[in-house]
């Protein structure tokens, strides 16, 4: 594995390449790069492209487990039941609630990170789900 400095530089460089490249921005990859930049290598489990792919496979696995590939089916799968993702009300302002690697580990986050998971699972299943910015919140919806 790369040294901590090299890994952090790699994540920042990759982030800049994506932003400056024009075209579509891969939400999942960007979210994992943010985790790597904020937490640093090792603690975020994202320090090179192979680890990004490994983290994205976690979203692939979630999508593969959705029994009904519809907006409602995805929401029900992700947000109900014993292994549901939940809002972290007790520690709402914990920065880790915004970091996708940590949210996937803990199954707890804030509306924006939970919406990213829902949008990315939907994208993998061909179900269009968009984020809607609201004052102090983000919610997921089906585009018109």
Q: Which positions does each model-derived feature cover?
A:
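A structural boundary/capping signal
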Residues: 1-144
């Amino acid at each position: 594995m790369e040294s901590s400095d090299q890994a952090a530089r790699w994540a920042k460089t990759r982030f800049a390449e994506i932003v400056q490249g024009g075209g579509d921005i891969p939400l999942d990859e960007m979210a994992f790069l943010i985790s790597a930049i904020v937490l640093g290598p090792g603690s975020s489990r994202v320090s090179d492209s192979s680890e990004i792919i490994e983290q994205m496979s976690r979203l692939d696995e979630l999508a593969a487990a959705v029994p009904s590939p519809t907006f409602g089916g995805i929401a029900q799968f992700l947000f109900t039941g014993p292994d549901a993702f939940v809002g972290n009300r007790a520690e709402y302002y914990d920065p880790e609630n915004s970091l996708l690697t940590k949210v996937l580990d803990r199954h707890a986050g804030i509306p924006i990170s939970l919406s990213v998971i829902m949008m990315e699972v939907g994208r993998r299943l061909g179900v269009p789900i968009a984020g809607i910015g609201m004052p102090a919140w983000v919610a997921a919806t089906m585009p018109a």
